[in-house]
Amino acid sequence: MIKMELKEAKYLGGIGAVLNLVSYAVGGILAIAGYVLILLALNKISKIFNDDEVFKKYLYGVVLWIIAVLIVIFAVGISFVSLSFIPLDYGLTAMSSFLVGVILFYILSVIGGYFIKKSYEKVSYYTGVDSFRICGLLYFIGTLLLIVIVGIIVIIVAQILEIVAYFSLPDDLKSEN
C-alpha cells in the first residue's frame, strides 16, 4: 500500500483559489499570486499521480487567459488613443480594433477554459473529489457565456467551488499499487 500526501497541494490550491476570488475586490496582483499557488498545487498533484497533463493543461489555460486579458487591454487602449487623435471619420478603425480585441479575448478565454476543465477532470479522477470536475465544467461554461456577461457570474461560482474542491482534498490517499 502506497501513501500519497496531498496536504501541501490542498492548502496551496485552496489559498490560491481564495486569492483569485478576493482579487475582484482587491486587485489583479492577488490573482497572479493565486494562480501561482494553484499551479504549484497542481504540479504537486501531477507528480504524485505521475501525470504531467494535470499541470500542463491548467498552465496552458492560465497562459491563454493572461494573453486574452492583455489583448483586450491593448485593444481598448488603441481604440481610445485612436479616437483621441484621429479625426472622427476614422473612428471605424478604432471600433474595429476594439472588436478584434474582444473577439480574440473571447476565443482565447474559451480555449483557456477548456484546458482548465480538462485539468480539473483529471484531478477529480485521481483524487475522487468530484467538485473539481464540476468546477472545471463551470469554468468552461462561464467562458462560453462571457459573450452575454452572465459568464462572469458562472466563473465566480466556479471559483467558489474551486475553493471547496481544494479544501475537500484528503490530506493523503492510499493506493494499492
From Swiss-Prot:
Pfam families: DUF996. The chain crosses the membrane at residues 20-42, 62-84, 94-116, 136-158. It is a multi-pass membrane protein. GO terms for cellular component: plasma membrane. It is found in: Cell membrane. The keyword Transport does not apply. InterPro entries: DUF996. Keywords: Cell membrane, Membrane, Transmembrane, Transmembrane helix. This is Uncharacterized protein MJ1644. It comes from Methanocaldococcus jannaschii (strain ATCC 43067 / DSM 2661 / JAL-1 / JCM 10045 / NBRC 100440) (Methanococcus jannaschii).
